[in-house]
Amino acid sequence: MPTVLQLAISRGGVPKLPILEADVTPLGIAGDVQKNRKYHGGPNQALLLITSEGLDELKAAGYPVYPGALGENVTTVGLDRRQVRLGQRYRLGAEVEIEITKMREPCRTLAPYGPTIQKAVYDPDVKAGRPESPRWGLAGFYVKVLQPGRLYPGDPIVLLADPC
C-alpha cells in the first residue's frame, strides 16, 4: 500500500525540510511559505506531491535530489507516478482528501540540482497531459485539498476516485 514517506515545509524556496506532522488546510500545510505566489500556492496548488521512486530515478541519473529537495510537501513511497492521473482523488491518512489538479511545470528554482534537471523531469508530452511520457510525474503533481486534517509520515494513501 502506498504511504506518506515525508512531509515538508519551508520559509520559501527549496529544499523543503521534514516535519513530524502536518496540519493540512485548503491552502496547504500550515507553516509552509511560497515566495512567488503568482506561480505557486493557492487552492488548486495547495500541495506538491512527488514519489520517492521518481526521486530514486533522478538520483540514478546523477541528480543530487532527496525528499524535499524539489520543493514537495508530500513525498510518497509505493505510489506509481505512471498511474497517477489528473482528477484522481486520494485519502491521505485518516482525514485528508486530495484531488490531483495539475502537473508541476519546473522553474529555475530547481537549478541547484543541475543545469539539465528541468528537461529531465518535464517534456512536451507531460505539458500536453500525456501520461505515456517517461517523465510523467517526475516534477510532481499539484493537488487541491478537498478535506483538511492532520497528516503524518507513514500514513496510508488510498485511491478514492479515478475519473479516467
Predicted feature residues:
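Metal-cofactor-dependent catalytic cores
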Residues: M1-C164
